[in-house]
């Protein structure tokens, strides 16, 4: 009977498909078991490899540094042997050498790698990270900026443009490095790229890390003139092709020869810009946009500072307000 033959064929096909499914499930279990046999270090390597195309070069470099230096008591442990006690012990050892932020970053990397290759193990890991320490930032005063500007202008011309771009425009060193003449037009600086070092230390051009990184920053006609000085080709680098590392080195050399000035990191010029915007009364959402942040969280968490002199003025105002109530009663 044709119907019977057809039914037998369907049954045979069903059995065959069932065998294939069982075999695939078995292979999946084998694969999961193999994943459990890799070490934490191997899991991190494979995690980086799987994400390499979408991670920024600086992030990859940071991951490689973590793998090489932090949580070393974990690196040769198989995922199948990993438990909360071992994990916490490795964290405790690192507390003597690294900041809470560094440890938190390392834990985040290990968690992500373990979750990718052994999610059931990750769900059983419970550790306590060291408490965050409130970070204090040095913010130079306007008087400091004026003094530094005048000295750089006369003695370190190579540093002049990076200094102005950071202190007056709020650019990151990597963005300064990528800036070319065609990024400046009609009173605007267009931020479209950054130059960073890859994990091998080679400078590469990349798109901004987030969509918010693409932005326009207003500049005065005089500033535009200064930035475009000695630029013969609009494709030419504004700062002579200096990398962020070279800018930092030049900045340190400047302070080495100006020992009467209080040293602060080049990145503090960006803090100065943010604080200046806050003191001018610019809304936080606009400051975030100018600085390339996707939200105001960073402004509130990091840049919500005022100049020490301005803070002193506010303290005096508060003290005077106390006198008012005492004098009227």
Locate the predicted segments by residue.
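C-terminal secondary-structure termini that scaffold catalytic or DNA-interacting sites
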Residues: 33, 199, 204-214, 221-223, ...
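Single conserved hydrophobic/aromatic residue that forms the stacking wall/gate
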Residues: 1-13
């Amino acid at each position: 009977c044709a119907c019977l033959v057809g039914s037998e064929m369907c049954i045979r096909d069903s059995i065959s498909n069932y065998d294939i499914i069982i075999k695939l499930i078995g292979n999946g279990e084998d694969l999961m078991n193999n994943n459990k046999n890799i070490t934490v270090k191997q899991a991190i390597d494979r995690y980086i490899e799987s994400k390499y195309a979408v991670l920024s070069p600086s992030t990859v470099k940071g991951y490689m540094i973590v793998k090489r230096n932090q949580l070393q008591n974990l690196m040769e442990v198989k995922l199948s042997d990993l438990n909360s006690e071992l994990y916490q012990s490795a964290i405790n050892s690192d507390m003597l050498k690294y900041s809470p932020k560094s440890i938190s970053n390392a834990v985040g990397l290990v968690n992500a790698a373990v979750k990718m290759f052994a999610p059931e193990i990750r769900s059983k890991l419970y550790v306590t990270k060291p408490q965050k320490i409130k970070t204090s930032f040095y913010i130079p005063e306007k008087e400091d900026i004026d003094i530094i500007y005048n000295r750089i202008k006369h003695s370190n011309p190579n540093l002049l443009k990076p200094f102005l771009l950071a202190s007056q425009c709020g650019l990151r060193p990597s963005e300064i490095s990528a800036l070319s003449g065609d990024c400046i037009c009609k009173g605007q600086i267009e931020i479209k790229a950054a130059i960073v070092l890859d994990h091998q230390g080679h400078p590469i051009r990349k798109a901004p890390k987030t969509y918010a990184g693409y932005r326009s920053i207003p500049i005065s006609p005089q500033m535009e003139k200064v930035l475009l000085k000695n630029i013969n080709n609009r494709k030419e680098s504004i700062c002579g092709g200096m990398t962020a590392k070279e800018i930092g080195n030049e900045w340190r050399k400047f302070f080495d020869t100006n020992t009467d000035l209080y040293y602060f990191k080049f990145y503090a010029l960006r803090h100065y810009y943010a604080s200046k915007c806050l003191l001018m009364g610019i809304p936080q959402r606009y400051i975030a946009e100018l600085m390339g942040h996707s939200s105001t969280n960073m402004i509130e968490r990091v840049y919500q500072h005022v100049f020490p002199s301005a803070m002193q003025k506010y303290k005096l105002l508060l003290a005077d307000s106390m006198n008012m109530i005492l004098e009227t009663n």
